Swiss-Prot record:
Any Gene Ontology CC annotation: chloroplast
Protein name according to UniProt: (-)-alpha-pinene synthase 1, chloroplastic
Binding residues for Mg(2+) 2: D378, D382
Tree of life domain: Eukaryota
PANTHER family for the chain: OS04G0344100 PROTEIN-RELATED, TERPENE SYNTHASE 11-RELATED
Binding annotation for Mg(2+) 1: D378, D382
Length: 627
């Protein structure tokens, strides 16, 4: 993503030469610049990971730089070789039968009390059922049933939380924590203050020394709830610290099991970087292996069978969409942009992980195309193009006419048409969904995005290190989040009239915070490599400039604290129960933020896409689950 600044690559006297230069006639000089590779936990260097910068000189004497990134990992032959039989109608029929059976499970909880559901467990049964179908990635089939179950639970919610059942005389930690999390995610007004009930007389969360499985699961629910925190909720911060420590200690004592794996997954990814399809894939592996709900009215085998089927049926759709995406990539002329990173399959994977409803093909493909273009532009502005060429390109983009590309270098002409054709194509899809032309929105986003690049170019040309405030405001735009999100969400079957769009897109708080997370988290992962390339400006360096005497470690601590605060603010913007904008209208912008955050969890997952990102592609797109 656009998370690096632009460096001047040629003097103005070279402009007349650069206009006729080609990206394909280059003489190469290489120098290696070491960069920090992060371990899986982001704590240590990986010696094998390094980044090199290639300096190239075209035949007409223009000096250029190229990032020595690894090539596209997913070639056309590999994509075409993928096979699946889960697109057959018989699998869809089997899934529909299972959907009907799961609906009966939901309905059985609404009938009269019986042996398996009664006044002493009816609340936890409902919450657990909702949580299960959501974690398994099959909740889209049960929207009415989920609402009915949560309405019932909420009707018994109080300032003391809830017990396991409506007639329970004491509050239960597992029921209350899981209820708090689930109700909050669905927009119900529930206060985190209920968690104070589970503290001892010293104001600390209480636990027993034995750490039984029941208690461990309760604390796991507490940890998951604590991640859905809003600004200023001290009890949620305390709950997160306590429960994380408790669970880490529990892992040292309990045997390897589905419970231990579930704890590791939740501690590893939390919530903001635990993408829904990724969570579904992981939860399929551990679901139904415990005995906690053996006396439940919930048939875990049916839920698991449906989850696996749905995962694989969508996998067959992913194959077709990937084939289309690869054809688009080739036909657009993208392979000729040899100076850039080609990560279209990785971007498609991110989109698949946050929107795997079949009807949202336009979103997935639009997101992959848009982010692919942003990344190529990032590399063009960051390393390959000269400042003078980039000024011409930026001005030509604002004219929005193919004839404007006539004055550009050959490689830029191709890039111009890729942007022009793709943006117009996605706008046509958006017009079908929204019933109005959205090109003006798209052009405004692209214009501001490229302007933010040019601002960074001027800073570098003049040697100016901006203040943190200057850098931060410009950097939120140059992060590319708004540009990546706007057009794809408009292709969805979700209405975005102007008054709703302004609460989701610029100038909304939701948009501002989503851009901020990408900027700040990206900087913490990229600033050392950027600095090694001579690109000094980052949130870390600008903060240190504003605060003389502050160490780099202090600056990182400050930025990480900012990220935590921004995440809580973003949670509030999504889930505020008093908001006039439905969660469904905000959810995908929020989830795009989660997807980008995941890519920077350990390292720059776009430049180094052959570790965690490759694993994500294989696990959620390439490989089906075993039935």
């Amino acid at each position: 993503m656009a998370l690096v600044s632009i460096a001047p690559l040629a003097s103005k006297s070279c402009l007349h030469k650069s206009l006729s230069s080609s990206a394909h006639e280059l003489k190469t000089i290489c120098r290696t610049i070491p960069t920090l590779g992060m371990s899986r936990r982001g704590k240590s260097a990986t010696p094998s990971m390094s980044m090199s910068l290639t300096t190239t000189v075209s035949d007409d004497g223009v000096q250029r730089r190229m990032g020595d990134f690894h090539s596209n990992l997913w070639n056309d032959d590999f994509i075409q070789s993928l096979s699946t039989s889960y697109g057959e109608p018989s699998y869809r029929e089997q899934a529909e039968r299972l959907i009907g059976e799961v609906k009966k499970m939901f309905n059985s909880m609404s009938s009269e009390d019986g042996e398996l559901i009664n006044p002493h467990n009816d609340l936890i049964q409902r919450v657990w059922m909702v949580d299960s179908v959501e974690r398994l990635g099959i909740e889209r089939h049960f929207k009415n049933e989920i609402k009915s179950a949560l309405d019932y639970v909420y009707s018994y919610w109080s300032e003391k939380g809830i017990g396991c059942g409506r007639e329970s005389v004491v509050a239960d930690l597992n029921s209350t924590a899981l209820g708090l999390r689930t109700l909050r995610l669905h927009g119900y007004a529930v206060s985190a203050d209920v968690l104070n009930l589970f503290k001892d007389q010293n104001g600390q969360f209480a636990c027993s020394p034995s750490q039984t499985e029941e208690e461990i699961r309760s604390v796991l629910s507490l940890y998951r709830a604590s991640l859905i925190a809003f600004p200023g909720e001290k009890v949620m911060e305390e709950a997160e610290i306590f429960s994380a420590k408790y669970l880490e200690e529990a892992l040292q004592k309990i045997s390897v099991s589905s419970l231990s794996q579930e704890i590791r997954d939740v501690l590893e990814y939390g919530w903001h970087t635990y993408l829904p399809r990724m969570e579904a894939r992981n939860h399929i592996d551990v679901f139904g292996q415990d005995t906690q709900n053996s006396k439940s009215c919930i048939n875990t085998e049916k839920l698991l069978e449906l989850a696996k089927l749905e995962f694989n049926i969508f996998h067959s759709l992913q194959k077709r969409e990937l084939e289309y995406l690869v054809r688009w990539w080739k036909d657009s002329g993208s392979p000729q942009m040899t100076f850039g990173r080609h990560r279209h399959v990785e971007y498609y994977t991110l989109a698949s992980c946050i929107a795997f409803e079949p009807q949202h093909s336009g979103f997935r493909l639009g997101f992959a195309k848009t982010c692919h273009i942003i990344t190529i532009l990032d590399d063009m502005y960051d390393t390959f193009g000269t400042v003078d060429e980039l000024e011409l390109f930026t001005a030509a983009m604002k004219r929005w006419n193919p004839s404007a590309a006539d004055c550009l270098p050959e490689y830029m002409k191709g890039m111009y048409m890729i942007v022009y054709d793709t943006v117009n194509e996605i706008c046509q899809e958006a017009e079908k969904a929204q019933g109005r032309n959205t090109l003006d929105y798209a052009r405004q986003a692209w214009d501001e995005y490229l302007d933010s690049y040019m601002q960074e170019a001027k800073w570098i040309v003049t040697g100016y290190l901006p203040t943190f405030a200057e850098y931060y405001e410009n950097g939120k735009v140059s992060s590319g989040h708004r540009t990546a999100a706007l057009q794809p969400i408009l292709t969805m079957d979700i209405p975005f009239p102007p008054h709703i769009l302004k609460e989701v897109d610029f100038p909304s708080k939701l948009n501002d915070l989503a851009c901020a997370i990408l900027r700040l988290r990206g900087d913490t992962r990229c600033y050392k490599a950027d600095r090694a390339r001579g690109e000094e400006a980052s949130s870390i360096s600008c903060y240190m400039k504003d605060n003389p005497g502050v160490t780099e470690e202090d600056a990182l601590d400050h930025i990480n604290a900012m990220i935590s605060d921004v995440i809580r603010g973003l949670n509030w913007e999504l889930l505020n129960p008093n908001s006039s904008v439905p969660i469904s209208s905000k959810k995908h912008v929020f989830d795009i933020s989660r997807a980008f955050h995941y890519e920077y969890k350990y390292r720059d997952g776009y430049s180094v896409a052959n570790i965690e990102t490759k694993s994500l592609v294989k696990r959620t797109v390439i490989d089906p689950v075993t039935l």
